[in-house]
Amino acid sequence: YKIADAAGISLPKDAKVIGLKVDAIGSAEILCKEIMSPVVILKSYDTFENAVAMAKQNMVEAGGVGHTGGVFTDNMDHVLYASERIPVSRLLINQPTPDAWGPATNGLAPAVSEGCGTWGNNIISENVNYTHMINISRTAMPLDVEVRTPAEVFGDK
């Protein structure tokens, strides 16, 4: 209720979230940045393709490229369309995006942190978990192999 009070908004006592309608997206709207509170922004769209384009624009302009996105749909064509276009390391379908940390219900690795890949200037684009905290030493011996030339590997041009 502190957020609502600070904004001069009165809420019912059983309110769980504040929904705010925005007219703009991306860098034109401060509320399109990551929000770490029970506030949700709402933006209408004409088609699913339009919604995906807005999501991508928002990620690029307001921050979040490489992080996590969410789509609520039962249409597998929509899932594939969004997966191919929204630049995120994790796209959650029909689940809240805080589940990106990897609960048993979605198959993502349980995380202590979330990597955003080179999109977000990170070294990895997966959930950082205990396997990333273990030092592994690798011993390499020479192999008896013929090394191909760059021309053989990549062609003449």
List where the protein language model places each region:
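Conserved C-terminal structural/oligomerization subdomain of aldehyde/semialdehyde dehydrogenase
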Residues: 9-157
